[in-house]
Regions:
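Alpha-helical transmembrane segments in inner-membrane proteins
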Residues: 1-343
């Protein structure tokens, strides 16, 4: 505890600093004085600057914090129940299910309805979000049903990976059969972005995530028991099958919602739990769960800042930035702690 609390406070301070930096720095240069006046409600000489701060940068900051924390916690739960350091939000095919749902809507809308989703504005965005949630939840329910039929985690893991490959194959066929404009729209969605959540959608997104994240913390006890294996957890009185089902449901729902609003951003979920373990040097989920959430939020803010770095028109793909920034950090952490229980 003597080491944990200062580290937690340091992460909170780092997040606050990154929030400020994300608001003040972006691809469009805005004077600091104008930003301060906008934030305190006094407005600015330029309506465009006001719109950039209030409708773009602030929503992106909040989205990055919530999405980063959700993906990181989801990845931590997956790695624990499968005892696999490479497990992440996409390991059971749930992210692929979300992508498949979006593919059906985006790639087939023009052919079946004669209207491209890109021309529908808010309704098109809502259709994409709903399709992603439906696709992810459909795969998650299939995984939950299968988990009640099989005993071993390895079997469930392999089945989940195969479902992911199947979804990817179907997406490939749909892309081959679809016009170039629809394929381009789907590819852009697949790059991931924290800028897609509008003010109207933000309330629902944040409320859902603020419900799911505390629910994840209620699963800390069975997660700690499952660290040493399902048999050990059962000896401690944990209903392993029920706990595994709830963990999959909670983790899968987190992924479904984030993917629906931000696109598939998988790397944070796989990498951040290792980063948190390396920093806090613990496997106790009472400490590791909040640490992972904070690290996920911080990394997402850093990646969002780099994606909108000054000197670039528009924003770089968040998925590319997360991999470029996170992979070297995780390789270093794993190398320094190469005698962990995973090896």
């Amino acid at each position: 505890m003597r080491r944990t609390l200062p580290l937690m406070l340091a992460l909170v301070v780092a997040i606050l600093v990154m929030v400020i930096v994300n608001v003040f720095i972006g691809s469009v240069k805005i004077p600091v004085g104008d930003i301060c006046r906008i934030l305190v409600g006094q407005g600015s000489e330029s309506e465009i600057w006001t719109n950039i701060i209030l409708s773009s940068r602030l929503p992106q900051v909040l989205t990055a914090i919530v999405a980063g924390a959700g993906l990181a916690v989801s990845g931590l739960m997956m790695q624990t129940i499968f005892h696999n350091p490479l497990a992440g939000p996409s390991i059971l095919g749930i992210s692929n299910g979300a992508s498949l749902g979006v593919a059906f809507v985006v790639l087939l809308s023009g052919q079946l309805g004669g209207v491209a989703l890109s021309s529908l504005g808010y309704l098109g965005d809502a259709a994409v979000s709903v399709a992603a949630i439906v696709g992810a939840i459909a795969v998650m329910m299939l995984i939950v049903w299968i988990s009640g039929k099989v005993k071993g985690n390895v079997t469930l893991l392999i089945i989940g990976v195969m479902i992911g490959y199947l979804a990817t194959a179907i997406i490939g066929v749909l892309k081959f059969l679809s016009p170039e404009e629809d394929v381009k729209a789907f590819v852009v969605w697949g790059l991931g972005s924290f800028s897609r959540v509008s003010g109207d959608q933000m309330i629902l997104f944040v409320v859902l995530m603020c419900i799911l994240l505390p629910l994840s913390f209620l699963l800390v006890k069975p997660l700690n028991a499952m660290l040493l294996g399902d048999r050990y957890a059962a000896n401690l009185g944990v209903n392993v099958k029920r706990a595994r089902t709830w963990i999959i449901v909670c983790s899968g729902t987190l992924v479904a919602i984030v993917t629906a609003y931000c696109g598939p951003i998988m790397f944070i979920g796989m990498a951040v739990p290792h980063l948190a373990r390396g920093i806090f040097r613990t496997s106790d989920h009472w400490k590791l769960m909040p640490a992972t959430a904070l690290c996920g939020a911080l990394l997402a803010l850093i990646c969002n800042l780099i994606a909108r770095a000054p000197g670039f028109e528009g924003a770089m793909p968040v998925n590319s930035v997360t991999a470029l920034i996170g992979a070297p950090i995780i390789i270093y952490v794993l190398y320094r702690r190469r005698k962990t229980s995973y090896e």
